[in-house]
């Protein structure tokens, strides 16, 4: 399973002119299920995202997670957006291949599982819409952008 995290001051997802998900300070999480992924990969990826210390402390060091933005328990938002294009393979030419992405039904199942687990573990979760044409608006903070990958064999 793959994800790209972007530390944001704010972010929102628009579908057909309507905002479907919106957060203030937190993480925009672009997520992709790959062939061979299962719930175990989703669990490991979510655990890493929630614990990753990429928010600054008082000294300006990346020392805080989305679960503790201010050192006093303030939590940031998670905006979770499905993006199968993270599985793109461009090694064979100039047109990306997406054969490494999970099949659409399996991708939706794992995305829904990932979101459900996030909702169970974190109080501030918003989402995009699976397989929709979305416009993602964000104010990248830093910028800080972190790619994550949990191997299907893990």
From Swiss-Prot:
It comes from Polaromonas sp. (strain JS666 / ATCC BAA-500). Keywords: Cytoplasm, Hydrolase, RNA-binding, tRNA-binding. This is D-aminoacyl-tRNA deacylase. The lineage of its organism: Bacteria, Pseudomonadati, Pseudomonadota, Betaproteobacteria, Burkholderiales. Homodimer. The keyword Aminoacyl-tRNA synthetase does not apply. Belongs to the DTD family. One of its GO terms (molecular function) is Gly-tRNA(Ala) deacylase activity. HAMAP family: Deacylase_Dtd. The keyword Transcription does not apply. A motif (Gly-cisPro motif, important for rejection of L-amino acids) lies at residues 142-143. An aminoacyl-tRNA editing enzyme that deacylates mischarged D-aminoacyl-tRNAs. Also deacylates mischarged glycyl-tRNA(Ala), protecting cells against glycine mischarging by AlaRS. Acts via tRNA-based rather than protein-based catalysis; rejects L-amino acids rather than detecting D-amino acids in the active site. By recycling D-aminoacyl-tRNA to D-amino acids and free tRNA molecules, this enzyme counteracts the toxicity associated with the formation of D-aminoacyl-tRNA entities in vivo and helps enforce protein L-homochirality. It is found in: Cytoplasm. It is an enzyme of class 3 (hydrolase). GO terms for cellular component: cytoplasm. InterPro entries: Daa-tRNA_deacyls_DTD (IPR003732), DTD-like_sf (IPR023509). One of its GO terms (biological process) is D-amino acid catabolic process.
